[in-house]
Structure formats: structure tokens, C-alpha cells
């Protein structure tokens, strides 16, 4: 039986745009996702987050559900545009009031709030000035962070600055699948990336200056590989591909965030392709100097799956999965090994406390005649993955 240590923190995580709704209520400004989702052809069937899970009105019910599950932590993101509608210092008291209610009620329930300051929903007003291509956005983020830290001082001590820069940059500014829907070359994408790293460093300084008890975290996602066998050569091969940053697949790596923030240096040419290496070589010195301010106290890892790897005759190579392998409704492979090997490799390289900040699966959920969702697939998935997590 899988046994977890007493200090293991069981919790749940959400994102503002994905659950809150209340898109135009109580002074909230427009985010890039508000604009993107209302642009014809951008989302499936024109879906938007205008209502979403309606957590803006039903947050008390959400907390009751958390209590019923005996969870001790809740990671939620704050909608920047609910706090500052245009991303400046136009503070919205009704926005603060909403999060005050949420935080205070969580604390009363014995559930510790973990705040994510940015989960993809940039104020549209800042995007119109260049968004993450513009270094001023990093400074605006630091101002927003300072205000949040001061407002919640003494109540919130667990902070994550960013969630998944890989999705923010690659899917928002590279492929255009996510807001703001741009398709920039690698150089333009990397400019966004370095500005997000810079923003984290400035924000970390604000959080620590406001309250020495604050813990600063960063949530990363990226490629995880696991060895096709226990042979040392395969273990080394999987490690190598986990941290590699080739030009054609550089963003979805933990390396691109965690090397600069945890090690104080960008990944070198031994890991990076030539185009990426050239971008790294052009990072302004003041951003490199700021990296020492941004070392996290904790890491959030979003891990859903992994890829099997072995040492081939010409170096590390991917192994084809067997026919009929299990997958989710989104066609993501079900790979419990990801929660075993992923945290191992990350811990070896960075040596910081870790949270599995996201994990789960998509299902084709059905409500049966008894009014319930008999969640067999999800129960099976979580059982498999928790065993892998317990082994770590």
C-alpha cells in the first residue's frame, strides 16, 4: 500500500479564467482570454469563460467541497484584471473584496491558500502595449505583486508567481493556439520568456521585502522522460532528454525556467540548439544580474505524462509505446512513471522542495440514471499515479 509522509500536503488547484466567470462584474477589466475567446474561430464552438464554473458566485460551495475532501491546501489564481482592470495602479476594491472572502473563509476552514499571481490571463490593456514582448509588463507585474503582498500580509504566505511559461509563450506567442493568438519566430518568443523570468525575479523581491515569512514559488511544466528499463544507460538517457532544449522543442522543458531561476544561469550550448543559444547570449546583463533575486523557495511541477526513452546506438532515443496504451479523452498517454522519474530528475538537478501543482485527466463524463458520475476512469488514473508519487 502506498504510504505518504505526514508532511505531505494534499490540496487542489484551479485557475481564475477557467472557473470564476463574472467576466464583466464589479469592475473587472478585460484580459487577453476575454478578447481571444470572443474572437470568432478561436475556441471550440465559440466557448468563453464568461460564466465558466461560476465560482465568482459559488466560491462558498467550492470551499465546502474542499472541506468534504479533507484537503489542507487550495492553490487558486488571482485574475490580475479583477485587481487592476488595466494592469496599472487602478486598484479595484471590489476585486480585493472577492479574494478577501475567499482567503478568509479558507483560513477559517483550516485550508491554507496558495496564490498563483498569473495563470495566463494578462490584462488586455497591457497586451495592446506589447504584452510579454514589452519589458514594461514585467515591471507592471512587480507593482501588482507588491500590492497583493501588502494586502494579504499575515494571511497568505504561499505564493506562486507564474503558472507554466511554456504555455504562456509557446502557445500564446508561438503557435497562436492560446491568447493572445500570436505567431512569433523563436526570437520573439524568447523575448517574452526572458521578460517573464525577469518579472518573476522582480516579484520575488517584492514578496520577500513585504513579509519575510512569504515563500516564493514558480510553477513549471515541460517534457518528462522515463527510462525504458532500469539499466543505468537508459536512466541517463531519459535524464538527458528531460533537460534538452533543441530549437524545435525548447519551450516545453523545465530547464528553460528552472536553470536560470534555481541555478542562476541559462542552459548552455550543450543543452540548447544554436538559435536558442544565440537568444540566450543576447539576454541583457541586468536581467542576468536579477536572477539571483528569483531563486524560488519551492517548485510547482505540473506533470501529466511522460515519454519512454532508451540509450540507442546514436544516443538517447524515444521508445514507441505499445499498441493500445491507455490514454485520456484528450489523447494524452496515461504514464504513472511520470510522477516517479520526473520529480527524481528535477530534485537531482535543483534540490528544492516540490509540489505536484497539477495532475489529472480528461474524461468523457456521463451522468447516470442515479444522478451520479461513476468516475471509474479517474479513480483508476489517480490510484496509479498516487502509487508513483508515493514511491518518490
Locate each region found by the language model.
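Active-site region of glycoside hydrolase catalytic domains
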Residues: 1-43, 86-88, 96-357, 361-389
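A common structural microfeature
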Residues: 7-9, 56, 73
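Aromatic- and Gly/Pro-rich amphipathic surface segment
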Residues: 30-64
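Generic alpha-helix structural propensity
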Residues: 54-61, 69, 78, 94-101, ...
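Catalytic domains of carbohydrate-active enzymes, especially glycoside hydrolases
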Residues: 58-79, 293-299
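Glycine-rich, proline-tolerant flexible connector loops at the mouths of alpha/beta enzymes
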Residues: 78-91
Amino acid at each position: 500500500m502506498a504510504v505518504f509522509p505526514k508532511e505531505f500536503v494534499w490540496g487542489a488547484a484551479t485557475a481564475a479564467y477557467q472557473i470564476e466567470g463574472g467576466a464583466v462584474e464589479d469592475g473587472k477589466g478585460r484580459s487577453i482570454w476575454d478578447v481571444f475567446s470572443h474572437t470568432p474561430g478561436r475556441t471550440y464552438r465559440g466557448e468563453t469563460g464568461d460564466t465558466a464554473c461560476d465560482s465568482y458566485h459559488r466560491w462558498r460551495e467550492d470551499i465546502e467541497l474542499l472541506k468534504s475532501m479533507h484537503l489542507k491546501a487550495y492553490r487558486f489564481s488571482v485574475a490580475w484584471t479583477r485587481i487592476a482592470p488595466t494592469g496599472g495602479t487602478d486598484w479595484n476594491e471590489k476585486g480585493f473584496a472577492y479574494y478577501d472572502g475567499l482567503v478568509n473563509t479558507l483560513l477559517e476552514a483550516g485550508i491554507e491558500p496558495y496564490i498563483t499571481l498569473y495563470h495566463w490571463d494578462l490584462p488586455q490593456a497591457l497586451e495592446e502595449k506589447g504584452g510579454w514582448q514589452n519589458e514594461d509588463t514585467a515591471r507592471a507585474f512587480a507593482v501588482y505583486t507588491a500590492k497583493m503582498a501588502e494586502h494579504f500580509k499575515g494571511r497568505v504566505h504561499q505564493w506562486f508567481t507564474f503558472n507554466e511559461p511554456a504555455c504562456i509563450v509557446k502557445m500564446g506567442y508561438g503557435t497562436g493556439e492560446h491568447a493572445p493568438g500570436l505567431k512569433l519566430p523563436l526570437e520573439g518568443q524568447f523575448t517574452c520568456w526572458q521578460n517573464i523570468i525577469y518579472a518573476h525575479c522582480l516579484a520575488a523581491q517584492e514578496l520577500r521585502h513585504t513579509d519575510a515569512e512569504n515563500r516564493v514559488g514558480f510553477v513549471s511544466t515541460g517534457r518528462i522522460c522515463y527510462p525504458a528499463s532500469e539499466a543505468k544507460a537508459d536512466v541517463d538517457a531519459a535524464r538527458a532528454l528531460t533537460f534538452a532544449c533543441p530549437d524545435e522543442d525548447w519551450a516545453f522543458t523545465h530547464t528553460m525556467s528552472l536553470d536560470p531561476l534555481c541555478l542562476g544561469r541559462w542552459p548552455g550550448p550543450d543543452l540548447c540548439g544554436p538559435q536558442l543559444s544565440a537568444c540566450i547570449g543576447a539576454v541583457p546583463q541586468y536581467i542576468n544580474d536579477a536572477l539571483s533575486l528569483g531563486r524560488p523557495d519551492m517548485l510547482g511541477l505540473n506533470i501529466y505524462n511522460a515519454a519512454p526513452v532508451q540509450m540507442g546506438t546514436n544516443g538517447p532515443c524515444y521508445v514507441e509505446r505499445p499498441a493500445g496504451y491507455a490514454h485520456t479523452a484528450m489523447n494524452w498517454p496515461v504514464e504513472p512513471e511520470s510522477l516517479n522519474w520526473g520529480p527524481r530528475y528535477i530534485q537531482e538537478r535543483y534540490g528544492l522542495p516540490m509540489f505536484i501543482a497539477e495532475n489529472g485527466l480528461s474524461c468523457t463524463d456521463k451522468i447516470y440514471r442515479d444522478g451520479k458520475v461513476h468516475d471509474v476512469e479517474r479513480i483508476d488514473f489517480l490510484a496509479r499515479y498516487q502509487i508513483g508519487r508515493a514511491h518518490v
